[in-house]
Design a protein with these regions (language model features):
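Pyridoxal 5′-phosphate
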Residues: 1-203
């Protein structure tokens, strides 16, 4: 989407991450201009599982320009972490249903009350004019059921994920030539992602 915006004439900058997958905050701040309208950050790095401190990033961005819209891609975070969009100051948050065992193609967008959204699909004005077209009722119901199921005994499920992840990492580290990324004590990672490298094998 951002490359498409660039083709349409928008100025788009990409922020670097360090070896642990964390945003370079100094670079992010340096890229903010008077005419910056949007900052979009992935909540959880989908390759190594690093968790961004979204609340801190939002604060840093908004302290420079409170009118910047802050979006986070929470596809890998929703259901795996406790997310509080209002408390964290998030304006837009996107979620994909299949990551919590909902129907493929389903998802939702959290929109902060004062955020203005321009529809990309025009027509009948469904979904409060944000996305026209006949609603996919089975997918909507399936997503709802997936959310209800996923958040039943939620903390217990997350603890189980962390236990399985730790067990997997311990076993992997016993194999010669295997490297597990982002496992230092100062890196907070999601419970469901393990990044592994094998000596002698490139991408």
């Amino acid at each position: 989407p951002f490359l498409y915006l660039k083709e349409q004439g928008f100025d788009v900058d990409f922020v670097s991450v360090d070896s642990n997958g964390h945003i370079d905050l100094n670079q992010l701040i340096s890229l903010i201009r008077d005419d910056t309208i949007l900052v979009s950050i992935v909540y959880v790095n989908n390759e190594i599982g690093a968790i961004q401190n979204i609340e801190s990033l939002v604060h840093s961005v908004k302290s420079i320009n409170k009118n910047i819209v802050f979006h986070t891609d929470a596809v890998q975070a929703y259901g795996k972490l406790k997310i509080f969009p209002n408390k964290e100051g998030i304006d837009l948050l996107s979620v994909s249903g299949h990551k919590i065992h909902g129907p493929k193609g389903s998802g939702f967008l959290y929109i902060r009350e004062k955020s203005k959204i321009k529809p990309q699909i025009l027509g009948g004005g469904q979904q409060e004019g944000i996305r026209s077209g006949t609603e996919n009722v089975p997918a909507i119901v399936g997503l709802k059921e997936a959310v209800l199921e996923y958040f039943t005994d939620h903390e217990k499920k997350i603890m189980k994920l962390y236990e399985c992840k730790q067990r997997l990492i311990e076993q992997l580290l016993q194999i010669e030539g295997v490297v597990v990324h982002a496992i230092s004590s100062d890196v907070q990672t999601a419970p469901h992602i393990v990044s592994v490298g094998f000596e002698g094998i490139s991408r």
